[in-house]
């Protein structure tokens, strides 16, 4: 325990300027950094130096000072990271086993099974760990890990990032050390990551590793409603994000047979869920509890539902910590398009309407319009209320009920009634089954090899993740029985991606280019094929998932065929179909493109499949406020001899855009268009192209700087007609007024811009 007895002493020790300079010079030499000015960095450190700073305070100050220069060049971020990681290594023990013992002694949080495995096989496990890989993290990534992911005792960080990765590998494969090594090496090398709850809870007591839970109330009664609230509370306690639907809960004013009273409707119920979410804290400063509530647009209280997150209005009708989402049927979209009437019903009278979809829904809905009481509104009036809510609050999400059911390998189980917290999971849930999804994402930039995307390496990793997520299903702790029952019966998984925009930049592909569109399709076809192949191989050994019979895949129908599309011919789909006919598949669902908000920060990738929001921006997280530079852009401009203090100021002055900086070659400007400059039609086209190979859905954000009714209507209908399941996760908008850019020397920027050569000579880097 020597490291821990010395930890406080190390923190309180003082570091001198000479030692700081020596260390920085060593980092620059070791990392072969060509763009770090040691004298300038040390000068900045000296300018704010305080003689009585402790070692911990000095480390924080020096790393923050280096990080403040990231906009000068991303290499300063490597210095920041090196300072922090070196310090973590100083104050933590070298032995993984000793750290686990220490955690168990002081917090008692390691599971007895995993504790026994670690103690028995400690030498084997420690021989696999490479702590040098901790230095692969960016400054931003390492701070995020320190703040929220690495295990602490009190305020003391006990483990290193590699220890966390080893916990994950051990949790998944236990004593199968060949697979433990394989998974650890890929995690350590930043090829993929498991979901945040898996990183948090692996090897701990009650290892709840799943991200997403979808709840349907058992019944419209006090007992049914509070059973749902109880489930939500317990799942939130164990780091799960929740999507639930209230389609079947009666509306305000409807009669209560048991008491003779009147229902207060869904708004007070949503406020109870809102308060529950606020009350329950998931692991202190870790993942906060979150709930998304789905409602069909025929529900009598739909207009009040749309008001829930608005900034103004009576507080008794607001629940701003809840995320709202719509579960939209085709008939509503048709009526909006044709400017027809729309009927609102109380679910206690419109019995079974949420239980059907497609033509069956249309027939029942039209029957109810003729036979039961209803409120009639113009469909476009409701549509306008939806758009107004989205412009003000960014929500509700737009999920298309009929597409989600029509294009689902779980359609044989019953009607799917909602998505999840992030609108990428589409699974069947009922009063008896709370659906679950276990997630992981692949870091796409890691598969660039000699200027090409390495599909074989990519396919190998997809197959490894498919196996991993099956083990997660098997070894997961299920906080409620309904979740265990559903996950064991249907065995859905969700493999996603991060860094698609980074991949395009590395390969010199503009987001809107034909090349990007083609690669996008090829990646997700390969991903679906590889996951399906691995799932079939597992089924050969372990049998198909228990609810396999009757599913589309049991009939030899792939997801892209449900969508009426054909595969490219790159892969042997017919051979795979024949193998599935013989053995089945182990999983009902395979691909789900989640937001990756937390893990992409750790691994230094752009989120999921999104375009870059900016080329220079401030990131705010639990760990603080950070300036992020698009390092691919900086590297390109450095090669062209264009990156300078003045250029940095120009990019800041242009709010992270380079489109008006004509000294930058046109090809480069095309590659680094931001989300605000890319046509949303192109973003939706990419989403639609990959959707045919995504058997769940995708957390698709829409970026419109100053959205209007007509713009949003156009985007929604375009995505709907393209066959998207999730038409919109969040609507991202920009502030009406820009913040004052205190760091910009505006006159110098203008002078530099006017003096630059504005000819668009071809870029040699883009011609290959």
UniProtKB/Swiss-Prot annotation:
Q: Where, by residue number, is the active site?
A: 420 (proton acceptor), 422 (cysteine radical intermediate), 424 (proton acceptor)
A Pfam family (short name) is Ribonuc_red_lgC
The residues the record assigns to binding GDP are 196, 211, 420, 424
Gene3D superfamilies linked: 3.20.70.20
Q: Which residues bind dTTP?
A: 220-222, 237, 250
Q: Where is this site: Interacts with thioredoxin/glutaredoxin?
A: 763, 766
Q: Which reaction does it catalyse?
A: a 2'-deoxyribonucleoside 5'-diphosphate + [thioredoxin]-disulfide + H2O = a ribonucleoside 5'-diphosphate + [thioredoxin]-dithiol
Q: GO BP, one example?
A: deoxyribonucleotide biosynthetic process
Q: Which GO terms describe its cellular component?
A: ribonucleoside-diphosphate reductase complex
> Which residues are marked as site: Important for electron transfer?
729-730
Disulfide bond entries: 212-437
Q: Which CDD domains match?
A: RNR_I
The EC code for this enzyme is 1.17.4.1
> Which keywords describe this protein according to UniProt?
Allosteric enzyme, ATP-binding, Deoxyribonucleotide synthesis, Disulfide bond, Nucleotide-binding, Oxidoreductase
Superkingdom to which the source organism belongs: Eukaryota
Where along the sequence does the record put site: Important for hydrogen atom transfer? 212, 437
Under PROSITE patterns, the record lists:
RIBORED_LARGE
Q: Which GO terms describe its molecular function?
A: ATP binding; ribonucleoside-diphosphate reductase activity, thioredoxin disulfide as acceptor
Q: Give start-end of the signal peptide.
A: none
Q: How does it assemble?
A: Heterodimer of a large and a small subunit.
Report the NCBIfam families cross-referenced here. NrdE_NrdA
Q: What does this protein do?
A: Provides the precursors necessary for DNA synthesis. Catalyzes the biosynthesis of deoxyribonucleotides from the corresponding ribonucleotides.
Q: So what family is this one in?
A: Belongs to the ribonucleoside diphosphate reductase large chain family.
- What name appears for this protein in its UniProt entry? Ribonucleoside-diphosphate reductase large chain
């Amino acid at each position: 325990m020597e490291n821990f007895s010395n930890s406080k002493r190390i923190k309180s020790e003082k570091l001198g300027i000479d030692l700081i300079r020596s260390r920085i010079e060593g980092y620059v030499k070791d990392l072969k950094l060509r763009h770090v000015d040691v004298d300038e960095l040390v000068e900045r450190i000296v300018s704010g130096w305080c003689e009585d700073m402790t070692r911990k305070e000095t480390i924080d100050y020096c790393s923050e000072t280096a990080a403040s220069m990231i906009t000068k060049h991303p290499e300063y971020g490597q210095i920041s990271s090196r300072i922090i990681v070196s310090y973590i290594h100083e104050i933590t023990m070298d032995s993984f086993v000793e750290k686990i013992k220490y955690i168990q002694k002081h917090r008692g949080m390691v599971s007895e099974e995993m504790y026994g495995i670690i103690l028995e096989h400690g030498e084997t496990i420690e021989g696999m760990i490479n702590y040098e890989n901790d230095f692969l993290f960016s400054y931003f990534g390492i701070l995020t890990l320190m703040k929220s992911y690495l295990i602490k005792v009190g305020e003391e960080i006990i483990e290193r990032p590699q220890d966390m990765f080893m916990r994950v590998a051990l949790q998944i494969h236990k004593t199968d050390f060949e697979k433990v090594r394989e998974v650890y090496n890929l995690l350590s090398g930043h090829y993929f990551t498991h979901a945040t709850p898996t990183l948090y809870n692996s090897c701990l007591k009650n290892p709840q590793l799943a991200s997403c839970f979808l709840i349907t109330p058992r019944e419209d009664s006090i007992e049914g409603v509070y059973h749902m609230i109880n489930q939500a509370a317990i799942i939130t306690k164990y780091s799960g994000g929740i999507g639930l639907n209230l389609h079947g809960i009666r509306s305000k004013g409807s009669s209560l047979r048991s008491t003779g009273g009147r229902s207060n409707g869904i708004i007070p119920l949503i406020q109870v869920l809102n308060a529950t979410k606020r009350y329950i804290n998931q692991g202190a400063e870790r993942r906060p509890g979150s709930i998304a509530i789905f409602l069909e647009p025929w529900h009598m209280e739909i207009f009040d539902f749309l008001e829930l997150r608005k900034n103004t209005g009576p507080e008794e009708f607001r629940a701003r910590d809840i995320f709202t989402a719509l579960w939209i049927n085709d008939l509503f979209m048709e009526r909006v398009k044709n400017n027809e009437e729309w009927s609102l019903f109380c679910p206690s009278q419109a019995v079974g309407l949420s239980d059907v979809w497609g033509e069956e829904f249309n027939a029942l809905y039209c029957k109810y319009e003729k036979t039961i009481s209803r409120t009639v509104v113009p469909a476009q009036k409701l549509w306008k209320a939806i758009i107004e809510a989205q412009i003000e609050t960014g929500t509700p999400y737009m999920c298309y009920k009929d597409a989600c059911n029509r294009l689902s390998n779980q359609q044989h189980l019953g009607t799917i009634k909602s998505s999840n917290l992030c609108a990428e999971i589409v699974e069947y849930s009922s009063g008896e089954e709370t659906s679950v999804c276990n997630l992981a994402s692949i870091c796409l930039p890691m598969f660039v090899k000699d200027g090409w995307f390495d599909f074989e390496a990519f396919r190998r990793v997809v197959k490894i993740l498919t196996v991993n997520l099956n083990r997660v299903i098997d070894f997961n702790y299920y906080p409620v029985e309904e979740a265990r029952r559903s996950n064991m019966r249907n065995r859905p998984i969700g493999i996603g991606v991060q860094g698609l925009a980074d991949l395009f930049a590395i390969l010199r592909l503009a987001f809107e280019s034909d090349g990007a569109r083609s690669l996008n399709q090829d990646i997700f076809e390969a991903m679906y094929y590889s996951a399906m192949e691995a799932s079939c191989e597992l089924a050969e050994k372990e049998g198909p998932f228990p609810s396999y019979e009757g599913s589309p895949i049991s009939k030899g129908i792939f997801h892209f065929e449900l969508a009426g599309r054909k595969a490219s011919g790159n892969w042997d789909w017919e051979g795979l179909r024949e193998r599935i006919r013989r053995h089945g598949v182990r999983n009902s669902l395979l691909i789900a493109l989640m937001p990756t908000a937390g893990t992409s920060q750790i691994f230094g990738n752009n989120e999921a499949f999104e375009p870059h929001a900016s080329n220079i921006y401030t990131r705010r997280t639990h760990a603080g406020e950070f300036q992020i530079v698009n390092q691919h852009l900086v590297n390109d401009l450095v090669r062209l001899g264009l990156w300078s203090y003045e250029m940095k100021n120009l990019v800041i002055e242009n709010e992270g855009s380079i489109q008006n900086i004509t000294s930058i070659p046109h090809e480069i400007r095309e590659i680094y268009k931001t989300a605000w400059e890319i046509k949303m039609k192109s973003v939706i086209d990419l989403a639609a192209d990959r959707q045919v190979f995504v058997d769940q859905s995708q957390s698709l954000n829409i970026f419109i700087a100053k959205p209007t009714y007509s713009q949003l209507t156009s985007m929604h209908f375009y995505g709907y007609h393209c066959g998207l399941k999730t038409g919109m996760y969040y609507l991202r908008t920009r502030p009406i007024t820009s913040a004052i850019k205190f760091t910009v020397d505006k006159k110098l920027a203008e002078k530099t811009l006017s003096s630059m050569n504005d000819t668009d000579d071809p870029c040699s880097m883009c011609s290959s």
